[in-house]
Amino acid sequence: MDLLSALTLETWVLLAVILVLLYRLGTHRHGIFKKQGIPGPKPLPFLGTVLNYYKGLGRFDMECYKKYGKIWGLFDGQTPVFAIMDTEMIKNVLVKECFSVFTNRRDFGPVGIMGKAVSVAKDEEWKRYRALLSPTFTSGRLKEMFPIIEQYGDILVKYLKQEAETGKPVTMKKVFGAYSMDVITSTSFGVNVDSLNNPKDPFVEKTKKLLRFDFFDPLFLSVVLFPFLTPIYEMLNICMFPKDSIAFFQKFVHRIKETRLDSKHKHRVDFLQLMLNAHNNSKDEVSHKALSDVEIIAQSVIFIFAGYETTSSTLSFVLYFLATHPDIQKKLQEEIDGALPSKAPPTYDIVMEMEYLDMVLNETLRLYPIGNRLERVCKKDIELDGLFIPKGSVVTIPTYALHHDPQHWPKPEEFHPERFSKENKGSIDPYVYLPFGNGPRNCIGMRFALMNMKLALTKVLQNFSFQPCKETQIPLKLSRQAILEPEKPIVLKVLPRDAVINGA
């Protein structure tokens, strides 16, 4: 007998009731935005609006802004997400209500010991880490690190010279990825790694494995859709980060700590040593204690995780723009030559004071901020500028969309470093330009990242010019990943400085 015809009326009724209950369960929060008249794409039961992310976060946010205006509602699974483009509201979230309501970032799954990282930690724990780590990023400390980073700039120049001699196009991410890796491993752990020439080095391999991330990874997606799975995964010892990489760094930090206990190492300037020395001046015992081994590992790993992609991708984007805008490339080289005649070695003060270099880097970060969004979790009910945001909701600030808003940036898709000249910079609203966030929980490594990128650009542009080639994708198209990166690797021709620039 056919299975369907064998089902009784009572069974059909029961199935219908179950389906209705499942539908109600999967849509029970969908009224949050309707009640306030907040527009947004139609969510699906349980999934919410996450399927739209396949377009790429930046592109999707741009579409939503054009369609719905400065505020719209999304659902990541069943988590309500308030997307805001209003600058006063952004200021309230990032600054005014930071400590009271919007202190924390969203959980993104079972992270193991990485829950101790400064960018992941919450409330008082985050405050303690921030206070302990902030002295590591003062201008004085950065000046001490500058010579360490400069030696990797020299290695970068040497490698590019070899590539230029072959006449073959160069993949920017490969070159600057290796540079970023070397700088971060050296400044984080005091380890000298030549990633370009030793890609099989265990430190390089474990770090690269750590950096692999996909927004549509089943584990990550399952936590986005069903946050209640996170504690279950943690009980099962399942982690978003590769365990062998974390174990490798745990062993390494423990070994290094043992060798650095004597006083002769206390004047080293890598982050690991500075963290070993770190103490908070607070009289409170909990916040006064130095970082534990686990906490040091978490901070070291997050420095790598955050710094590698930011530096390598941004440098690749900068050189793409310079190659396709030869007049801007020439003007920047003239500034560098004027500040450092006859290819003089750069110094911290000279590099950080170059105005046009700063303008070029800022405009690149406007067009291509590495993070498509900034997010904060609402930890208690609040009414913000007439908008009710319930506890547990997420507020997202679509950075990419803000940076491309024609209301704030005339001809936003065009590359114009003059937007950030001394004459124009003062008129820029600080809440429409957010490559490193803003407020108490902005990127703690911002100054280090800027110094690192400016030094690399200075060394490279002292020696080379860059041109598009047939492999260069023009115009550049972006991938659909959560982290902003090109659809195809940026490939450019590298020429010694005495070559003529014929850029497209």
Curated annotation (Swiss-Prot):
EC number: 1.14.14.1
Catalytic activity: an organic molecule + reduced [NADPH--hemoprotein reductase] + O2 = an alcohol + oxidized [NADPH--hemoprotein reductase] + H2O + H(+)
Cofactor(s) recorded in Swiss-Prot or TrEMBL: heme
Gene Ontology cellular-component annotations: cytoplasm; endoplasmic reticulum membrane
Record's bilayer topology term: Peripheral membrane protein
Tissue: Expressed in liver.
Xref: InterPro entries: Cyt_P450, Cyt_P450_CS, Cyt_P450_E_CYP3A, Cyt_P450_E_grp-II, Cyt_P450_sf, Cytochrome_P450_3A
Domain of life: Eukaryota
The UniProt record lists the keyword Endoplasmic reticulum: yes
GO biological processes: alkaloid catabolic process; estrogen metabolic process; lipid hydroxylation; monoterpenoid metabolic process; oxidative demethylation; retinoic acid metabolic process; retinol metabolic process; steroid catabolic process
Inducing or repressing factors: By pregnenolone 16-alpha-carbonitrile (PNCN) and dexamethasone.
GO molecular function, one term: iron ion binding
Keyword annotations of the record: Endoplasmic reticulum, Heme, Iron, Membrane, Metal-binding, Microsome, Monooxygenase, Oxidoreductase
Binding site for heme: C443
Compartmental location: Endoplasmic reticulum membrane; Microsome membrane
A Pfam family that the UniProt record links to this protein: p450
Family: Belongs to the cytochrome P450 family.
Function: Cytochromes P450 are a group of heme-thiolate monooxygenases. In liver microsomes, this enzyme is involved in an NADPH-dependent electron transport pathway. It oxidizes a variety of structurally unrelated compounds, including steroids, fatty acids, and xenobiotics.
Name recorded for this polypeptide: Cytochrome P450 3A2
Organism: Rattus norvegicus (Rat)
Lineage, opening ranks: Eukaryota, Metazoa, Chordata, Craniata, Vertebrata
Gene, per the UniProt record: Cyp3a2
